[in-house]
A protein has these predicted regions:
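A structural micro-motif
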Residues: 3, 28-29, 77
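Conserved Asp/Asn-Gly motif in the active-site loop of CheY-like receiver
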Residues: 31-38
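A generic structural motif
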Residues: 26-31, 47
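Short hydrophobic helical patches associated with two-component signaling proteins
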Residues: 17-22, 112
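Conserved acidic segment of CheY-like receiver
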Residues: 2-14, 18-19
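Conserved sequence signature across two-component system core domains
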Residues: 8-9, 34, 52
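A structural signal for short coil/turn segments at secondary-structure junctions
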Residues: 25-26, 74
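CheY-like receiver
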Residues: 41-130
Length: 131
């Protein structure tokens, strides 16, 4: 089964780069993308993605607010947060919310492959166990 991906980042060049990641290698399809958290929340409700890849610092609603919203409404959604700030406080908040992973920008694509592979495997295992 194809996994649905939602990508959120307020920097167009980063958003474009994340969209060009070889998602199909992992059986994933991008269902939406947005440049602010508020639009991201609307897309979460519209598509109920399996994975949300979100920047932390965005206009309207930040990635932490988006992650809390998604986890409250769709607890099985896996969230990977991205940030250019190496801040312990962001990492703490991410852990408290229950995000799957936390990546620093600029994104190392080798590390991203590891994180996406691990996250997809976890989702598929959980889906299989629920059947």
């Amino acid at each position: 089964m194809e996994l649905k991906i939602l990508i959120l980042d307020d920097e167009y060049i980063i958003l474009d780069g994340l969209c060009s990641f070889p998602w199909e290698m992992y059986g994933c399809r991008i269902v939406g993308k947005a440049m602010d958290g508020e639009e991201g929340m609307e897309l979460i409700d519209r598509y109920q993605p399996d994975i949300i890849l979100s920047d932390i610092k965005m206009p309207e609603k930040d990635g932490i607010q988006v992650a809390k919203y998604a986890k409250e409404k769709y607890p099985d959604t896996e969230i990977i947060l991205l940030t250019g700030y190496d801040s312990f406080s962001y990492a703490q908040q991410a852990i408290t919310i229950g995000v799957a992973d936390y990546l620093l920008k600029p994104v190392n694509f080798r590390e991203m492959h590891e994180v996406i592979g691990k996250t997809c495997k976890k989702i598929r295992k959980n889906q299989f166990e629920r059947q």
